[in-house]
Amino acid sequence: GMARLNRPSIFVYGGTILPGENHTDIVSVFEAVGSYVAGDIPITQLEHIEKTAIPGAGSCGGMYTANTLASAIEALGMSMPNSSAQNAVSDNKKQDCIDAGKAIVYLLEHDIKPSDIKTKKAFENAITLIITLGGSTNAVLHLIAMADTIGVEVTLDDFVRIGEKTPVIADLRPSGKYLMSELIEIGGIQPLM
């Protein structure tokens, strides 16, 4: 939407969910359902996991589509620094909203549009970050579509080229061990950029 309109704009991400009891998340619920169906846990345990794994507001706690794309948008330069790595329910997220308000005033005053920010190099930075984070493969479709909308050529070949020289260094769920909230604790994505 921002690229199609090409008006000064900034993305404000809602933030990630805090972990549930005993380091649980949405995947814990899926696994518990499977365990219950297999007869490995009683219904009371399944219900307890369902009630405690998702403690409040925010996107899924791992490097799923929402956190992946929020990180990519930050790397593109379309959101505030470190805004993709904030818990939904936090003072940092409130401050991010205030900072975004100040930033949009600057963008409007200087007529800085998405087409000025979303360059080929910006998309390459976003792709590099997503690969480093082990982000969702949905980023491929979304970033190609975003680039096309703004008139920048990004193809699957760009992902392959960048991926061949970029290691995955984050160990984030769903395939890894850690949650986004733990990446936040060590500084978010800024140290990676």
Put a short name on every predicted segment:
Residues 141-152:
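Alpha-helical support elements that line or immediately flank enzyme active sites
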Residues 1-125, 129-130, 135, 143:
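Active-site cavity-forming subdomains of large catalytic enzyme subunits
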Residues 81-83, 153-157, 191:
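Acidic/polar loop patches that form or flank catalytic/metal-binding clefts of enzymes
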Residues 13-19, 53, 146-148, 160-169:
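Acidic, glycine-rich active-site loops and adjacent beta-strand->loop/helix elements
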Residues 8-11, 150-158:
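Phosphate-handling active-site elements
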Residues 135-141, 172-174:
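Short acidic alpha-helix initiation/capping motifs at coil-to-helix transition points
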